Amino acid sequence: MDKIKKEIEDLRSKINYHNNLYYNLDNAEISDAEYDGLYARLKFLEAMNPDYADAASPTQKIGGAASRVFTSVTHASQMMSLDNTYSSEEVLRWHERCVKSLGHGNFEMVAEAKIDGVSCSLTYEGGVLTVAATRGDGKTGEDVTANIKTIKTIPHNISFKNKIEIRGEIYIEKADLKRLNEIQENEGENIFANTRNAAAGSIRQKNAEISASRPLKFFAHSFGYGDVDVKGFAEFMDLCKSWGFSVTPNRIRTADINEITSFYKRFEELRAGLPYDVDGIVVKINSFAEQKILGVTAKSPRWAIAFKYKPPQGKTVVNKIIFSVGRTGIITPVAELEPVAVAGVIISNATLHNFDEIKRLGVKEGDTVIVERAGEVIPKILNVVKDGGGNEVKAPKNCPSCGSKVYRYEDEVAIRCINPACPAQIKGHLLHFVSRAAMDIDGFGEAVVEQVVEKKYVKDFADIYNLKAEQLLTLDLFKDKKVNNLLLAVEASKKRSLSRVLYAFGIRHVGQKTGEILANHFEDIENMLAASLEDFQKINEIGPVVGQSVYDFMQSAKGKEEIARLKTAGVNFTQPKVQLAGNELLGKTLVFTGELNMPRTQAEALAKAHGGKVSGSVSSKTSYVVAGADAGSKLTKAQSLGVSVISEEEFLNLIK
């Protein structure tokens, strides 16, 4: 088994084991520092090897906890991340962009402390706190209402009676962390590595009484939506304060960008003396009207920027430089380091990106280097401080996985293996194909992919659908029940929508959203096979580059063969049509709760295909709550709000 893949698999297994102990059984075996080291290592390896990504990885679950502990909440307004920088020059460039977009430079800005905590949204209806949710992926978070209500600095009732969502940061003060860790030690429990980890672990406890025992606090810093009669951010913060929320006192309001950079420098000296951890400042355009003019990108608002302090660094030795082969054939160098603690996390690997970067750094095995956690997440080598006398690292002439000659295209810095039969690439493609966001074949993880490729049972996507029980019985730890479950999962995946199949193919530039756009436009794979290059390129949001990539795949012998073989195997290649009229779900909002006979994803897809909208939380605007067995708080809330509650059978009758 490939060394990196095996390490990733082992790390995921260990982290899932410790997550279950910590979050579900409240019985951790390792310290938070040790856990953070495992988690940071896994996240780094996944970032360096995106082809090994798996939606089921613990790095894809907020705070590391198993997502089944909490129900999901769909944010009415996306909780976006902020663009961030460590450079005053970049802040000045941000200001210049705002000046250009607004047409003047006399707008006010607000700069305030960036608390190092956990983002949370609070929804109030009729002045009552109804839902508290984690940020999650920005679109969907987790319902942590019961735990959040134990935080004394969060009011359960406010005087504002219209519906409003207030956002802020949950944190633990430094002194409180010290006391909490003393209690943990006295009780024989593991201590927390830092305030942020303590806050994250505390709000995501299955037992709300544990959350109540933790010294959590909350600073309000923005709002998601709500009809408030204020013109700008500073006024809104004053309003929040009048409602009983705590807001950061470390704030300035000015129209002078130089005052912002001066505040940043002054505050860096002061932050060590603050009772809470701060990792930078946030700068926002004050006026809501001007914020609206500036707008947002897909991930962040243009009217705000996080001006962060430089990440922590450490000194260590490069033990070895290895080469990793990704799904697309790109060969990436990775430095294996003598483990070093940086900001409470053990770092034992660092990205070298590409061979030009190795040359720029002049790094060799045995060198002493400065490593930093860029963005406090992904470790990288900053520079060499002592020559270890090792040999110069040269780019491989042959693929470390298959031995084929490697190539470097003129317009790329990356070195690639272009052998389609390369085991590393085949495994990477298969892992992507079976992943949850693609064909979602439950149980077809890395260990299975590794073995079916090594045993030559599977060499392409279609081979997955030709696997036999007797073949699977030869795999490690596979007995009759496990074989049957995997074969059922493979069979179920044949019904996935065209959009998911397109994403599963791994066509360059085709992500989940692009797959949906293409599938909704063409509706059937035959239409795509018959389409011209112009047909692809003229689609809104596709454009020439993506259009060319998709067209090339559809016209390639390999693409046509793969599609034909998958069709023969019974894989669906059509996109469900949205019913525009003549049914009960058109324009209605549905919430699914409890255990259904069909997979939740299938039920949600059916609702969307018939014109419905799916939400993760219940409100007065919910049309139907579809309740299965063991329905919990969503059912209770629906009943209290008078929302129509229907069974799975009644739901299916609505879409007949």
From Swiss-Prot:
<keyword id="KW-0464">Manganese</keyword>
<dbReference type="InterPro" id="IPR004149">
    <property type="entry name" value="Znf_DNAligase_C4"/>
</dbReference>
<dbReference type="Pfam" id="PF00533">
    <property type="entry name" value="BRCT"/>
</dbReference>
<feature type="binding site">
    <location>
        <begin position="32"/>
        <end position="36"/>
    </location>
    <ligand>
        <name>NAD(+)</name>
    </ligand>
</feature>
<feature type="binding site">
    <location>
        <position position="422"/>
    </location>
    <ligand>
        <name>Zn(2+)</name>
    </ligand>
</feature>
<dbReference type="GO" id="GO:0006281">
    <property type="term" value="P:DNA repair"/>
</dbReference>
<feature type="binding site">
    <location>
        <position position="169"/>
    </location>
    <ligand>
        <name>NAD(+)</name>
    </ligand>
</feature>
<dbReference type="GO" id="GO:0005829">
    <property type="term" value="C:cytosol"/>
</dbReference>
<keyword id="KW-0862">Zinc</keyword>
<comment type="similarity">
    <text>Belongs to the NAD-dependent DNA ligase family. LigA subfamily.</text>
</comment>
<dbReference type="GO" id="GO:0006260">
    <property type="term" value="P:DNA replication"/>
</dbReference>
<dbReference type="InterPro" id="IPR001679">
    <property type="entry name" value="DNA_ligase"/>
</dbReference>
<feature type="active site" description="N6-AMP-lysine intermediate">
    <location>
        <position position="114"/>
    </location>
</feature>
<feature type="binding site">
    <location>
        <position position="399"/>
    </location>
    <ligand>
        <name>Zn(2+)</name>
    </ligand>
</feature>
<dbReference type="InterPro" id="IPR001357">
    <property type="entry name" value="BRCT_dom"/>
</dbReference>
<dbReference type="Pfam" id="PF12826">
    <property type="entry name" value="HHH_2"/>
</dbReference>
<feature type="domain" description="BRCT">
    <location>
        <begin position="580"/>
        <end position="656"/>
    </location>
</feature>
<dbReference type="InterPro" id="IPR041663">
    <property type="entry name" value="DisA/LigA_HHH"/>
</dbReference>
<keyword id="KW-0479">Metal-binding</keyword>
<keyword id="KW-0460">Magnesium</keyword>
<dbReference type="InterPro" id="IPR018239">
    <property type="entry name" value="DNA_ligase_AS"/>
</dbReference>
<dbReference type="Pfam" id="PF03119">
    <property type="entry name" value="DNA_ligase_ZBD"/>
</dbReference>
<feature type="binding site">
    <location>
        <position position="112"/>
    </location>
    <ligand>
        <name>NAD(+)</name>
    </ligand>
</feature>
<dbReference type="InterPro" id="IPR010994">
    <property type="entry name" value="RuvA_2-like"/>
</dbReference>
<keyword id="KW-0436">Ligase</keyword>
<dbReference type="InterPro" id="IPR012340">
    <property type="entry name" value="NA-bd_OB-fold"/>
</dbReference>
<dbReference type="GO" id="GO:0003911">
    <property type="term" value="F:DNA ligase (NAD+) activity"/>
</dbReference>
<dbReference type="InterPro" id="IPR036420">
    <property type="entry name" value="BRCT_dom_sf"/>
</dbReference>
<keyword id="KW-0234">DNA repair</keyword>
<dbReference type="InterPro" id="IPR033136">
    <property type="entry name" value="DNA_ligase_CS"/>
</dbReference>
<dbReference type="InterPro" id="IPR004150">
    <property type="entry name" value="NAD_DNA_ligase_OB"/>
</dbReference>
<feature type="binding site">
    <location>
        <begin position="81"/>
        <end position="82"/>
    </location>
    <ligand>
        <name>NAD(+)</name>
    </ligand>
</feature>
<dbReference type="Pfam" id="PF03120">
    <property type="entry name" value="DNA_ligase_OB"/>
</dbReference>
<keyword id="KW-0235">DNA replication</keyword>
<feature type="binding site">
    <location>
        <position position="135"/>
    </location>
    <ligand>
        <name>NAD(+)</name>
    </ligand>
</feature>
<feature type="binding site">
    <location>
        <position position="417"/>
    </location>
    <ligand>
        <name>Zn(2+)</name>
    </ligand>
</feature>
<dbReference type="InterPro" id="IPR013839">
    <property type="entry name" value="DNAligase_adenylation"/>
</dbReference>
<dbReference type="GO" id="GO:0046872">
    <property type="term" value="F:metal ion binding"/>
</dbReference>
<dbReference type="Pfam" id="PF01653">
    <property type="entry name" value="DNA_ligase_aden"/>
</dbReference>
<dbReference type="Pfam" id="PF22745">
    <property type="entry name" value="Nlig-Ia"/>
</dbReference>
<feature type="binding site">
    <location>
        <position position="402"/>
    </location>
    <ligand>
        <name>Zn(2+)</name>
    </ligand>
</feature>
<protein>
    <recommendedName>
        <fullName>DNA ligase</fullName>
        <ecNumber>6.5.1.2</ecNumber>
    </recommendedName>
</protein>
